[in-house]
Every structure is written in C-alpha cells, then in structure tokens.
C-alpha cells in the first residue's frame, strides 16, 4: 500500500506516499506529514 493524495505519511518512511503518482510526504510536524 502507498498513500494517495491527502493521506497521512510518516517521515521515517513506514507510511510512504505513492511515488508513481509523484506524491511527496510534506511534513506536518516532526513525525508525520501528508501526501501532496
């Protein structure tokens, strides 16, 4: 599974965004971010 647009992600990569959709994990704090 990979995170879709608007999904949460973790900065350590355990919850990653879909690279194939060119989504990046934009940090919200020191631990989590959002796929945009």
Swiss-Prot record:
Statement: the UniProt record of this protein carries the keyword Cell membrane: no
Covalent S-S links between cysteines: 2-18, 9-25, 17-35
Domain free text: The presence of a 'disulfide through disulfide knot' structurally defines this protein as a knottin.
Name of the protein described by the UniProt record: Asteropin-A
Keywords: Disulfide bond, Knottin
Purpose of the protein: Sialidase inhibitor. Competitively inhibits bacterial sialidases, but not viral sialidases. Does not inhibit glycosidases or proteases. Has no antitumor activity.
């Amino acid at each position: 599974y990979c995170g879709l647009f608007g999904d949460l992600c973790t900065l350590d990569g355990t919850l990653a965004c879909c690279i194939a959709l060119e989504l990046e994990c934009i940090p919200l704090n020191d631990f989590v971010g959002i796929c945009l």
